[in-house]
Every structure is written in structure tokens, then in C-alpha cells.
Regions:
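Sec-dependent N-terminal signal peptides
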Residues: 3-12
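Small/polar (Gly/Ser/Thr/Ala-rich) solvent-exposed segments
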Residues: 35, 59-73, 111-118, 128-156, ...
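Membrane-embedded beta-strand positions in outer-membrane beta-barrel channels/transporters
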Residues: 124-126, 169, 270, 334-336, ...
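Periplasmic alpha-helical coiled-coil/stalk elements that build and connect Gram-negative outer-membrane
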Residues: 22, 46, 152-272, 382, ...
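Small/polar, glycine/serine/threonine/aspartate-rich low-complexity segments that form flexible
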Residues: 62-125, 253-263, 295, 308-339, ...
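Bacterial Sec-pathway N-terminal export signals of envelope proteins
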Residues: 14-73, 246-288, 340-341, 369, ...
Length: 462
């Protein structure tokens, strides 16, 4: 038990405090979404390499060896010249006018002729090079578009992770501030109970006021306990968001920003959205990729040209003559040209389908732009509203604080009741909470604005 307490104490001492930037770095390193996005980038790179490889020469080493155990004969008719042999008896047949010649005409004589040797061998290199193929070049262009699509998707995931991390961070910060508000309220309630007991003991107030003071303390204890619970849950949610170990302690440091003097104009941020928003880039890249599908199908009507070459060494010999020195050069070079003439309108149908898909992607992209601009308008108005709430909240908090001090002084002098002091306490708590809520809304609006205009990934070319 002693060692456990020592370890717990050391853990509390050496627990690191994390600011927002450090938490974002942790999220971008450990978040499952970013890991998936990184694997998608690797897949995109593999597609690019694969597409370009189709335009590179293909070089292959080949070798073969054959041992013929039985060589089949080929029947061939050989003619017997005049005056040589009788095809039946094999004896010479003289003529009347010349004993050295045959009487008959040329007579074919069938014999079996074996065309082959005991051993044959070949080794060498085959080379194939695409000179022109529209589908190959369309594939290379498509791989570049796919790379742009993957990068935009990665940036979109990154924007979402950063936004979720910031929202979780400021939610924890809000719950910590709320806990502080109710802790101060509980302390004021306890001080009020102490003063009320003194007044009651001196006969300056009645028992009902004492009961109200005790009830106020119990109410504030319950509220404070609930606030601490919400703070713990918000912190656990932050750990899950950034991929932090739930068993480790996590302390955050930071503060809400006060209202800013100048809020950017809507036209300015709308232009930034259209130029930088990863989701728009993602759909535009998808449209470009589908447009390359159209080009790929159009290339089916174009000719293809391929160059083929071979550099071989070959020999075919019987066993005694099969040696390295008998290998002979056997090289060739050829060019192959293919020109499509008719394929049953299949290519035409594929082109129609590809064009329709490309148009759908374009319409989807335009619709997304309009929706994002509408969301941006909402964010911009929320930013203005939250800014005004902060300015008003600061004034209300100042008035509520003065009101509570006045009510407390009047109660101590017996000039007011516990109910009026309780009302002042509630007003002070409400003013503090409303100001915190306004600051939180302002901060969240800034977070959403950053994601809307793609601020977190601006200039990212990875």
C-alpha cells in the first residue's frame, strides 16, 4: 500500500501539462482516422507507380532446354532419277538406246526423314516497349488525379481531426471553468451559512433564515459534484478523441479567447473557402478523375503501337555436338500496330456512361459549394453573435458581482432577507455561466471557421 501511494504521488508530480498544439500533434499521430488516411496515400502512390510502369519498357530474361528421346519421322517422297534403280527390286534398268538410263519416267520413292536433334537450348532477352497507347497515357493522367483526390481526402480527415480535438479541448476547458464557478459559489454559501449562524446565535435573525442558508449549501454541494462529474467525462472524451491512453493522467492548460475587435468580412472568408476547402478540392479531383475515364474510353478508338525485340542464343545438336560454342545468334525486331474497327458499340456506351458520371460529380461539387457557403454564413453570424454576448456578459457579470456584494452587506446588517441574498447568488452564478458559455460559443465558432476555410491544411502539398 505504501509503494502504491508513493507511485501515485510521483505520478501526480510528474504528470505533464498539455496545451492545445501538443494535443493536436498527438491526435494527428495516434488517431485511427489519420492512420487510415496515411494508408490511402500509400495506395495512391502504388496506383501512380503502376500506371507509369505501363509506359516503361518490359524486359524479360528467357531460357529453355529440350531433350528429345524419340524424334518422330516425317514421310517425304524423293524422286528416283532416270536409269538409277528399279523402285521395286533396286536393280538398274537399262533402256534400248542407252543402257545407263531408265525406261520409265521419274518415280517418287517415299522415305522417313527425322527432323530434329537430341538436344536444343535457348537463352536471351525479350524487350517490349509501348510506343503509343491512349489507355496507357490516360491511366497515367488518372493516377495523378487520383493522387490529388487522395491528398484532398487526407486534408479533409486532418481538418476533421483538428476540429474535433479543439472542440473536445474547449469543452474540457468549459467544464473546468464551470467547476470553478460552482466551487466559488459553494464557498460563498458556506461563508453565508457561517455568518447566518452568528446572526442566529446573537438573535438578529430567525431559524428560517438559518434553514435557507443550510439548504443553499446542500444545493451548491450537489451542483458542484455534478460539475466535477461533467469535467471528468469531458476529459475522458478528449482522451478518446486524440487516441490518448485512458489509464494515464491528462492535464490541459489554456484559456478562452476574449472577443476580437475585427471579425473578417463574409466575402473574404467565402473566397478562402472556395479556394482552400479540402472537401471542395476532393470533389473537384473526383470530377477530374471521372473525366479521365471518358478520355480512357475515347482512346479505345485510337491505334496502339508496340515495339518488340529479342536477343537470343540458340542451338539444336545431337549429344556429342551440344556445347556452348555452338550457340548461335537469333535476334529479331518487330513493330505491332493495332487499329480498332468495330466492337459492337461497347466503347460508345462506356463513353456515354463515363460522361454522365462526370457530370454528376460536377453537379455534386457545385451543390456542396452552395451548402458550405450556407454553413459559413451560419458560422459567421454565430461568431458575431457570440462576440456581442461576450461584451454584454462582461457588463452583466460586473453588475451581478456588485449586486451580490450589496445584498450580502445588507443581509449582514439585517436590512434584507436570505431570499434576496439567494437571488443575488443565483444572478451571479448565471452571469458567470452565461459569460463562459458565450466565450465557449465564440471559440467553437472560430474552430468551425478554421475548418470551413481549410485554414489548418493551407499550403499542404504532401
Amino acid at each position: 500500500m505504501k509503494y502504491f501511494l508513493i507511485l501515485l504521488f510521483l505520478n501526480m508530480i510528474f504528470t505533464k501539462n498539455y496545451n492545445l498544439s501538443e494535443l493536436i500533434n498527438i491526435a494527428l499521430e495516434k488517431s485511427p482516422q489519420i492512420k487510415l488516411a496515411n494508408e490511402d496515400k500509400k495506395i495512391s502512390l502504388s496506383h501512380s507507380i503502376e500506371a507509369r510502369s505501363a509506359a516503361l519498357p518490359r524486359i524479360q530474361f528467357v531460357t529453355s532446354a529440350t531433350r528429345n528421346y524419340n524424334v518422330a519421322g516425317q514421310p517425304i517422297d524423293f524422286p528416283i532419277p532416270f536409269g538409277v534403280l528399279n523402285p521395286v527390286t533396286g536393280d538398274p534398268i537399262p533402256t534400248e538406246w542407252n543402257p545407263g538410263l531408265q525406261e520409265t519416267e521419274i518415280i517418287p520413292y517415299e522415305t522417313m526423314f527425322s527432323m530434329g536433334r537430341d538436344y536444343s537450348g535457348l537463352y536471351g532477352i525479350n524487350i517490349n516497349q509501348t510506343i503509343f497507347d491512349g489507355r496507357v497515357f490516360a491511366g497515367i493522367r488518372a493516377s495523378n488525379k487520383f493522387k490529388n483526390l487522395t491528398n484532398a481526402s487526407y486534408d479533409s480527415q486532418k481538418e476533421e481531426i483538428i476540429e474535433n480535438t479543439k472542440i473536445s479541448f474547449y469543452t474540457v476547458l468549459l467544464t473546468k471553468k464551470v467547476t470553478e464557478v460552482f466551487h466559488k459559489s459553494l464557498k460563498r454559501s458556506k461563508d453565508n451559512l457561517f455568518n447566518t449562524k452568528l446572526l442566529y446565535d446573537s438573535g438578529k435573525t430567525n431559524e428560517l433564515e438559518l434553514i435557507r442558508a443550510e439548504s443553499m449549501v446542500k444545493d451548491q454541494e450537489t451542483t458542484y459534484s455534478n460539475a466535477k462529474k461533467n469535467e471528468i467525462l469531458a476529459l475522458e472524451k478528449l482522451k478518446l478523441t486524440i487516441g490518448f491512453n485512458l489509464s494515464q493522467n491528462l492535464n490541459i492548460v489554456g484559456a478562452f479567447k476574449d472577443s476580437i475587435q475585427i471579425i473578417p468580412e463574409f466575402n473574404e472568408i467565402s473566397n478562402q473557402l472556395l479556394a482552400q476547402q479540402p472537401r471542395i478540392k476532393q470533389l473537384e479531383a473526383n470530377h477530374d478523375l471521372l473525366q479521365e475515364d471518358v478520355n480512357s474510353y475515347l482512346s479505345e478508338f485510337l491505334p496502339s503501337i508496340e515495339l518488340t525485340g529479342s536477343i537470343h542464343k540458340f542451338q539444336s545438336q545431337n549429344k556429342d555436338n551440344f556445347t556452348w560454342k555452338n550457340f548461335q545468334d537469333n535476334s529479331s525486331l518487330s513493330i505491332n500496330i493495332g487499329l480498332p474497327l468495330f466492337n459492337g458499340f461497347g466503347s460508345t456506351a462506356r463513353i456515354m456512361r463515363a460522361k454522365a458520371n462526370a457530370k454528376k460529380a460536377y453537379y455534386h461539387s457545385e451543390d456542396l459549394k452552395n451548402n458550405l457557403l450556407l454553413d459559413l454564413r451560419n458560422i459567421h453570424l454565430s461568431l458575431i453573435e457570440a462576440n456581442e454576448k461576450i461584451n454584454a456578459g462582461n457588463k452583466k457579470l460586473e453588475l451581478a458581482s456588485r449586486g451580490y456584494n450589496i445584498a450580502n452587506d445588507l443581509f449582514l446588517t439585517g436590512m434584507t432577507t436570505q431570499l434576496e441574498l439567494l437571488g443575488a447568488e443565483v444572478s451571479l452564478n448565471r452571469a458567470e455561466l452565461n459569460l463562459l458559455q458565450a466565450k465557449y460559443e465564440f471559440q467553437i465558432a472560430l474552430v468551425k471557421l478554421s475548418r470551413a476555410i481549410g485554414k489548418n491544411t493551407t499550403g499542404n502539398t504532401k
